[in-house]
From Swiss-Prot:
It is an enzyme of class 4 (lyase). The N-terminal domain does not have lytic activity and probably modulates enzymatic activity. The C-terminal domain is the catalytic active domain. Residues 1-22 form the signal peptide. It is found in: Cell outer membrane. The lineage of its organism: Bacteria, Pseudomonadati, Pseudomonadota, Alphaproteobacteria, Maricaulales. The keyword Membrane applies. It catalyses: Exolytic cleavage of the (1->4)-beta-glycosidic linkage between N-acetylmuramic acid (MurNAc) and N-acetylglucosamine (GlcNAc) residues in peptidoglycan, from either the reducing or the non-reducing ends of the peptidoglycan chains, with concomitant formation of a 1,6-anhydrobond in the MurNAc residue. HAMAP family: MltF. It comes from Maricaulis maris (strain MCS10). Its EC number is 4.2.2.n1. GO terms for biological process: cell wall macromolecule catabolic process; cell wall organization; peptidoglycan catabolic process. This is Membrane-bound lytic murein transglycosylase F. Murein-degrading enzyme that degrades murein glycan strands and insoluble, high-molecular weight murein sacculi, with the concomitant formation of a 1,6-anhydromuramoyl product. Lytic transglycosylases (LTs) play an integral role in the metabolism of the peptidoglycan (PG) sacculus. Their lytic action creates space within the PG sacculus to allow for its expansion as well as for the insertion of various structures such as secretion systems and flagella.
Length: 456
């Protein structure tokens, strides 16, 4: 089990566990902590699993991820830091919780009737759908009666086994295989490689996986919405009450919604052609320029994945790209912008990346101070696309219409109005194709997320 000490950041919740097999001796059980001892030690021990929707392991820093942010936020509410213990599999996670090796289990755990009989859970913080994921052109059981025709492999100890057992009551020929592990992602990759016909994954993971492996398809939903919650050690006096109070506050304050948007709201409608092209170009174009993106990011407060994602949206990583309006290169710079940032050859990959990154940094610094957090970056990216003047106009219009001029979500709804004569005629910078920066930012966020998780 891998361990990370971590500091506090955003929000959370999660849940799960299973009984120990009757043929194995039960694990030794530690004496339970109390909330007071947790605070005295300054540490909340969080059991979790590695995967795109829970915890992402970073070679050069602490882990990141949806569940990491949630757990960090809850730990901060207690005045402590979170230490993450990463289990190798779901059964290991459940055993560790039963043995008292952790205070909470936060790993995208589905709150099922079987688990509820054995474990204590936090309030529900997210809902997902269990989906049957298969390979394009392969076995595609869109009807339940066709499920026995498929070679199905699922995660050992998962809620997916419970789902299949329930289906098997009426479809008695149904069979499936299981594999141990902490995430369904390797099973999705196995389906993509032809090692199995289908697997089951939560909808937010399936959505992510299809953007890395475009030949995967969702054959059908197997459940309605399923609740996710944290499991916790019920022997710790006051922990359940603390979780209930914190989740209620996190929901009321919009923290759960914000975190969900940060990690899972970045994907728009699925476009098979676009995703397949992106995957090909990650393989055959990105390696030529990755070092240049990394070097540019080292000098600025941006991740290399962000710069690479922006360049892909601009030019599909084509250094000779040129538009009808005369912008050129990987970062599609205008002649005046190139002169402003001090480059003389817009088609030179290194110069283009350095110049584009410098220009984005300049825009970022010019965003009003009242715009904070991720919204500041989305604002700067939109300005790169449509111009800072039009972004200022959008802020003015947002204010007139009673919207929050500092919120990217609100501006994303206001910007398309810049093509409406009733509005742009009253603004300083006039007409703009305001839907374009909205799509521009959305696509960069999607590509950035895929690049950041490419090594998972």
């Amino acid at each position: 089990m891998k361990t990370w000490p971590s500091r506090a950041v955003s929000l959370l919740l999660l849940a799960l566990a299973l009984p120990v097999g009757c043929s194995e001796p039960p694990p030794p059980v530690r004496d339970p902590d109390t909330l007071a001892t947790i605070r005295e030690r300054g540490e909340l021990v969080v059991l979790t699993l590695a995967g795109p929707t829970s915890l992402i392991e970073n070679e050069d820093g602490p882990p990141s991820g949806y569940e990491v942010d949630l757990a960090n936020a809850f730990a901060a509410s207690l005045g402590v830091t979170a230490r993450f213990e990463v289990a190798a599999s779901l059964p290991d996670l459940f055993d560790a919780l039963a043995a008292g090796d952790g205070h909470v289990a936060a790993a995208g755990l589905t709150l099922t009737p079987e688990r509820s009989e054995r474990l204590a859970f936090s309030p529900v913080y997210k809902s997902v759908t269990e989906q049957l994921v298969c390979r394009r052109g392969g076995v595609n059981p869109t009807r339940l009666e066709r499920l026995p025709d498929a070679d199905i492999v699922v995660l050992e100890g998962s809620s997916y086994e419970e789902t299949l057992r329930a289906i098997g009551v009426t479809h008695t020929a149904l069979r499936w295989r299981t594999r141990p592990g902490g995430s369904a992602m390797p099973l999705l990759e196995a389906v993509d490689d032809g090692q199995a016909d289908c697997t089951i994954a939560d909808s937010h993971l399936a959505d992510f996986a299809r953007r890395r492996h475009p030949e995967l398809i969702v054959a059908r939903n197997l459940t309605g919405e399923q609740p996710l919650a944290w499991a916790y050690d019920a022997r710790i006096d006051g922990l359940g009450e603390a979780l209930s109070a914190w989740f209620a506050t996190a929901h009321a304050d919009g923290l759960l919604e914000a975190l969900d948007e940060t990690w899972f709201g970045r994907f728009g409608d699925y476009d098979y052609v676009d995703v397949a092209r992106f995957v090909r170009r990650v393989e055959n174009r990105l390696p030529r320029y990755r070092r240049l993106f990394e070097a540019a990011a080292d000098e600025l407060p941006f991740e290399w994945e962000l710069l690479a994602a922006q360049a892909y949206q601009e030019s599909h990583w084509d250094p000779d790209a040129v538009s009808a309006t005369g912008v050129r290169g990987l970062m599609m710079l205008t002649l005046s912008t190139a002169e402003r940032v001090g480059i003389d050859d817009r088609t030179d990959p290194e110069q283009s990346i350095v110049g584009g990154a410098a220009y984005l940094d300049d825009l970022y610094e010019r965003v009003p101070d009242s715009v904070t957090g991720p919204d500041r970056l989305w604002f700067a990216l939109a300005a790169y696309n449509v111009g800072m003047g039009h972004m200022y106009d959008a802020r003015r219009l947002a204010e007139r219409l009673g919207r929050d001029k500092d919120s990217w979500d609100d501006l994303a709804e206001i910007l398309p109005l810049l093509s409406d004569p009733a509005h742009y005629s009253t603004l300083r910078y006039g007409y703009a194709r305001g839907h374009e920066p909205v799509r521009y930012v959305a696509k960069i966020r999607e590509y950035r997320a895929l690049l950041a998780a490419q090594d998972l």
